Swiss-Prot record:
Organism from which the protein derives: Cereibacter sphaeroides (strain ATCC 17029 / ATH 2.4.9) (Rhodobacter sphaeroides)
Alphabetical UniProt keywords: Cell inner membrane, Cell membrane, Chaperone, Membrane, Protein transport, Transmembrane, Transmembrane helix, Transport
Localization per record: Cell inner membrane
Its job: Required for the insertion and/or proper folding and/or complex formation of integral membrane proteins into the membrane. Involved in integration of membrane proteins that insert both dependently and independently of the Sec translocase complex, as well as at least some lipoproteins. Aids folding of multispanning membrane proteins.
Protein name: Membrane protein insertase YidC
Annotated stretches, region: Disordered: 601-623
Membership in a protein family: Belongs to the OXA1/ALB3/YidC family. Type 1 subfamily.
Major location category of this protein: membrane
Amino acid sequence: MDDQNKNLILATGLSFLVIMVWFFLFPPPEAVTEGETTVATQQTAVAPSATPDAPTTAVPPDAELPETQRVVIDTPRLQGSISMLGGRLDDLSLKSYHETLDPQSQIVRLLSPVGQPNAYYALYGWTPAGALGYEDVPGANTTWTQVGSGALGVDQPVTLQWDNGKGLVFTRTISVDDHYMFSVAQTVENNSGQAVQLAPYGIVARHGKPLNLQNFFVLHEGVVGRADGKLTETKYDKVAELPQVAREGAQAEVIDAQQDGWIGFTDKYWMTTLIPQQGQPFTSVTKYVPGADIYQAETREQLVTVAPGATAEVSSRLFAGAKEWETIRAYQNEGATEPTEGAEPIPGFIDSIDWGWFFFLTKPIFTVLHWLNHMIGNMGLAIIALTFLLKALVLPLAYKSYVSMARMKELQPELEALRERAGDDKMLMQREMMRLYKEKQVNPAAGCLPILIQIPIFFSLYKVIFVTIELRHAPFFGWLKDLSAPDPSSIFNFFGLAPWAAPTPGTTMALIFIGALPILLGVSMWLQQKLNPAPGDKAQAMIFAWMPWVFMFMLGHFASGLVLYWIVNNLITFTQQYVIMRSHGHHPDIFGNIKASFSRKPAAQPAGKAANDGAAPAKKRKP
């Protein structure tokens, strides 16, 4: 076989192998059945300890308070309530996001109180030190009272208060911006006759693993945090395997940060994160309580000494919402989504989005894609425009590869003559071929580059489409309402023309009866092959014949945005290769190659045509 076909088969086969490995390593996430619902537990979060001699124990069980003992949360993007029991932020839903494409479906609920399946909440408090005991400071079961009245809203903070009856008055003022950032100011007024010591803390607790946990290898779900510039990601299974720490009374990992950081729980699209004051030391804790099946992320700030008659205040923040790129970036760079006096930037907050191994590609790719979507107004068209930009970026390298492929065609007569002279002497054949390539300045491996260069770009774009919320429920045109999901159409019901429904996504039937977009992908790959005639070797010809259709089924369950990218990429590659081949005197017989692919017996090629490997003879140039 000629080297061009050999290289093309090698590159295509490698791409196929990589996608196969990807398919088996990263299978589609399994849907959670109703039977897998975790039974709610009444156990609450484990209170932290500030000093080695202060024991860490689980807070006793509690009962939920009636709705009248809650403070309503109502902002343009959030709705929910704060429980007066412990002052917990434990009821929060995102107004801008629905569970499904149906606008009448339920909005996404992020936080839920104890007593419901998979309780998920944020809790603040103080850890006692010195002469103080846990009964002297507010905890998970402290009943707070609201100072004044009214709901928590943008520019409408609420204040909670608790008096321990021993001279200490605790106040908690909670405010929220127009996106997803809560500010929590905790104060303690010392009206006793002696100085007291105590330390503020924040906890985000999850009872059991999330119901919709995808357990996808390529996706991080679990604890995410940053301390002094170092990002840490710990999946739920790994949290449950942490070593037992006696001082914590649980399995835990404790990190002391000196300058900045944050910690919390991240899902695919949502996140709840504790953000202490930046520029000051704090302790970051990841914890698991096996008996109660509670996962915790904690921040503990420095011990505070409050003199008699004095008041101490500590402020922190809580992010609870969608991982929108612009929003997260604004918090990282400016500390707020709008210019706000005193707002502290949050270093490294953009890394709470799971950019993956190819972060050096996924970050710039998404940045450009987001800008294109903002300019065009349609994510599908933005993906198409991004494909053109990426192809333009790699055009110089691709051009050299296509030129090398065209020169390889010119060498076919000389290579055939070499084969006849060398006979069975493979060493002689190899030596003469290398001499010929060097003499003609041809790189036989250059034909692999156009295909191989797509692999990291393909995987990076896959990651972007899979994890960024901007692609969630992003429509294109027609039947493609969600570019982050597979093509919903199906051959089974003739693409919606038949009166019966398409197979359920994720089932074997859905993998077999693919949609219109994967079929277009197969056709685009098949058309790209027709720039060259089928190889003379039967094994090669069979590989070439089956490859487009194998890829068609392999990628049929991938996100439609990714399949759209590959289709456009194939069409651009086809056009580039066709133009470059013609510019070097080769005229691909596309229709002839298509016709030959349907004939049972390959027609004998004229000598002149065979010499050019299916291309029309080049015209002689005038000297």
